[in-house]
């Protein structure tokens, strides 16, 4: 029948963790004044500033208000309580809309999701301890189209050959793919944070009807609409890594009692990795006039 150690059975462990993430607190921003350089200058749907007239008074704006005589009411008739936004008309919607406040930050930032799964097999038998496992992590970021996927494998073996000799090895491998959001001049979060409170960043289509290469945004076209970016562009980082070590240990019997011992150990290890990066900008990206695939 053998010893008890010989009868140890393999142990299989499976674990999964799931979690969700939301932005717990957003910074306060003014939602009184509309897009424009100043109150006296009036509403300006091309301005990068949000110090125009009060949102509640947009219907009375001399140039765009539906309560006023201007080029838009001359064409479409009076629109009491509304104002005209040329960006809506460019997107194929009615240019006339009722002033209201939108949560552009909350609309853009979604719910993140994280999943971690581990499967492990281990056993101790005849002086050999081993453990092998695989794991997976998947994450969807709170910023649309961002996330991570990682697969990994691990092996560990320790072998007590006899009272004097021990050997073993460990090896780890991982493959990680990360899709991230751009920063600096190509950043999208600065566009989300700076969106005028009365501009429906989510609801207004991000490109002209039938022409996805012509973006629509509340400010100049040198900035990318974050929803357009999430649909068309990608920043990818892929890393493969392997590392581990092996050892051989000798402990001679010196016959000097338990308080004295000598161990001689030789060990070698490795750590290798490769990383590749891909930047994909489709035709219509504002940072370049042409589409770009950079690897």
Predicted feature locations:
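Residues embedded in well-ordered regular secondary structure
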Residues: 4-144, 182-185, 231-236, 247-251, ...
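Transmembrane beta-strands of outer-membrane beta-barrel proteins
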Residues: 15-17, 133-135, 170-172, 265-269
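Acidic/polar loop-and-plug regions of large Gram-negative outer-membrane beta-barrel proteins
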Residues: 97-98, 180-243
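Repeated loop/turn-to-beta-strand initiation elements of outer-membrane beta-barrel proteins
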Residues: 127-130, 164-167, 255-256
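Small-side-chain secondary-structure face that scaffolds active or pore-lining regions
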Residues: 142-152, 172-174, 178-182, 240-241, ...
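Feature captures outer-membrane beta-barrel proteins of Gram-negative bacteria and organelles
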Residues: 153-158
């Amino acid at each position: 029948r053998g010893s008890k150690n010989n009868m140890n059975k393999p142990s299989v462990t499976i674990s999964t963790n799931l979690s969700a993430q939301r932005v717990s607190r957003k910074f306060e921003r003014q939602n009184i004044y509309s897009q424009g350089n100043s109150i006296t200058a009036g509403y300006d749907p091309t301005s990068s500033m949000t110090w125009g007239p009060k949102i509640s008074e947009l219907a009375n704006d001399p140039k765009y208000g539906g309560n006023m005589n201007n080029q838009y009411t001359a064409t479409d008739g009076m629109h009491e309580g509304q104002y005209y936004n040329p960006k809506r008309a460019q997107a194929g919607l009615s240019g006339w809309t009722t002033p209201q406040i939108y949560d552009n930050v909350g609309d853009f930032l979604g719910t993140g999701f994280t999943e971690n799964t581990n499967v492990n097999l281990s056993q101790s038998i005849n002086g050999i301890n081993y453990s092998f496992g695989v794991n997976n992590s998947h994450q969807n970021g709170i910023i649309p189209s961002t996330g991570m996927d990682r697969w990994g494998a691990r092996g560990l073996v320790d072998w007590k050959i006899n009272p004097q000799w021990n050997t073993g090895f460990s090896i780890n491998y991982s493959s990680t793919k990360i899709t991230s959001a751009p920063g600096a001049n190509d950043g999208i979060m600065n566009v989300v944070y700076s969106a005028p409170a009365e501009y429906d960043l989510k609801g207004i289509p991000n490109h002209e009807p039938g022409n996805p290469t012509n973006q629509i945004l509340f400010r100049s076209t040198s900035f990318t609409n974050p929803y357009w970016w999430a649909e068309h562009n990608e920043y990818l980082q892929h890393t493969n890594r392997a590392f581990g070590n092996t050892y051989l240990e000798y402990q001679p019997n010196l016959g000097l009692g338990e308080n004295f011992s000598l161990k001689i150990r030789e060990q070698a290890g490795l750590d290798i990795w490769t990383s590749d990066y891909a930047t994909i900008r489709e035709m219509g990206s504002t940072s370049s006039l042409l589409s770009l695939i950079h690897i």
